[in-house]
A protein has these predicted regions:
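Alpha-helical support elements that line or immediately flank enzyme active sites
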Residues: 1-14
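Non-catalytic C-terminal accessory modules of carbohydrate-active enzymes
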Residues: 15-111
Length: 111
């Protein structure tokens, strides 16, 4: 989700960038240790069609290490401080419609 946010920001779609970071989906959650909760349906199980997506009640976890908190920090830092070629717009990765107030201090632009 942070990769989608950074891509959307660079494409001049800051609302989509924020929406990607805040997307409510089971795989865009963070555990206390910073990992992303990669949950899957148990073998043979089906998602509850009434819910529209698998619920977090399923406990089958994928055995992988995904430190998503680092990606989240990189994405928000880039969205706030900018990147080479961003036109020197303040907080270019956030909508400039009054819905966000962004203050940045000491974070350099990404290439």
């Amino acid at each position: 989700f942070p990769s989608m946010a950074m891509t959307a920001a660079r494409l001049g779609r800051p609302k989509d960038a924020v929406d990607a970071l805040l997307m409510e989906t089971p795989k865009n959650t963070y555990l206390p240790n910073g990992h992303n909760a990669q949950l899957s349906l148990p073998s043979g199980a089906e998602a509850d069609s009434a819910a529209g997506s698998p619920s977090l009640i399923f406990t089958t976890r994928l055995p992988i290490y995904l430190p998503g908190n680092g990606a989240l920090l990189l994405a928000t830092g880039m969205m706030a401080s900018g990147w080479d070629g961003d036109g020197n717009v303040p907080a270019p990765g956030f909508p400039n419609d009054g819905s966000w107030t962004v203050a940045v201090e000491g974070i350099g632009k990404l290439p």
